[in-house]
Amino acid sequence: MTYLSQIKIPAIYMRGGTSKGVFFNLSDLPDSAQVPGTARDNLMLRVIGSPDPYGKQTDGMGSATSSTSKTVILSKSSLADHDVAHLFGQVSIVKAYVDWSGNCGNLTAAVGSFAISSGLVDATHIPENGTATIRIWQANIKKTIVVQVPITNG
């Protein structure tokens, strides 16, 4: 029996609102998955455990519901006045398909925390105590989203 080789990719499983998803820093993905296309889609499908003809996603991080079959890819934004760029993928449970056309407001609520903890936000924008305002470019829908993240003791 032959097995595909495994690679290590840093990621965080996060909850935002009623949804859960796997968050990635774009620069941590393999080169082939840093650009849109089949390699990126196949990686997201594999991580979530899709397609699963039984609808269970037992071989991945998905939990067999549309609210838990999600991925987020973040990077520093190249746009002025934005801290991070956010790409959202809704992963089908039973089909080999990732929908990159929409956004998940629930997981967007977790983007600021991930961006700060991953070092994607300039440290000068993060108070020791108070509220950090994070400007997100949501690449799927081409909109600016502003989130506020409470900070205690840095």
What are these regions (language model features)?
Residues 1-154:
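A glycine-rich beta-to-alpha transition motif near the start of alpha/beta enzyme domains, typified by
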